[in-house]
Amino acid sequence: MNNYLALFDNNMIQARSLSTIYINLRDNVHIEDKYISNLLKAQLVNIVSAFDMFLHGIVKKGVIEIFNKTRKETSKFQSFSFQAKTILRLLEVMSPNFIPSSSDEITDVILEKELSRQLSFMSFQSPDKVTDALSLIWNEQHKIQVLSDKMEISGSNINEKANNLKQKLTTIIQRRNQIAHEGDIEPTTQLPRSIELLDVELATDFIYALAHAVFDAVTAADCYS
């Protein structure tokens, strides 16, 4: 799973560069904010995409690990279904006498393609979608509570911390959706919504910390057989 975390980190570095460009254009070139604020909006969209891509990657990897008996099964995995043709193909390539003639005839490759097909219809962004996806590979019953503790989210108790995590993530996703799906136009005024550099920086830090907390949780020793 290290490769997926490294890819996520690289995507986040690229996303952060947009606010760096924004600051340079604002402070050194003195371009008005209305002409460059789309850089910040693009960064917000990109960090959510990076997180979604990261989750898709580790879920696929985790399911393959379960199939290979190196990761502990979860109840959600036990109810996960594959197409009949995929099952037949797996049985064929797993036969002791089968000799693969290409990389497409390797168990892990077949599984990854099938998982990519199934998961491509899903987005792992909102708190409920995130926990549902992680249930395929992580048996923890109180996922948000564990993640909020790892991230040191503020709150007077573990449930308040969990609620604060969910609220922060929901706010980021809602703002992302306004940009990506609504043209980021305020319905009443028909003018573009404003966006603040600090808000984008905080959102970026939050998504980065969340992904790393997820990685630490799903790669813990007790997740493996």
What do the predicted segments below correspond to?
Residues V45-V48, I207:
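Hydrophobic aliphatic residue packing
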Residues M1-V45, G57-I64, N68-S79:
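Charged alpha-helical initiation segments
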Residues I47, V59-N159:
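Helix-loop junctions and short alpha-helical segments
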Residues S49-M53:
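Extended alpha-helical coiled-coil scaffold domains characteristic of the BAR superfamily
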Residues N2-T20, H142-S225:
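Polyanionic, low-complexity intrinsically disordered segments
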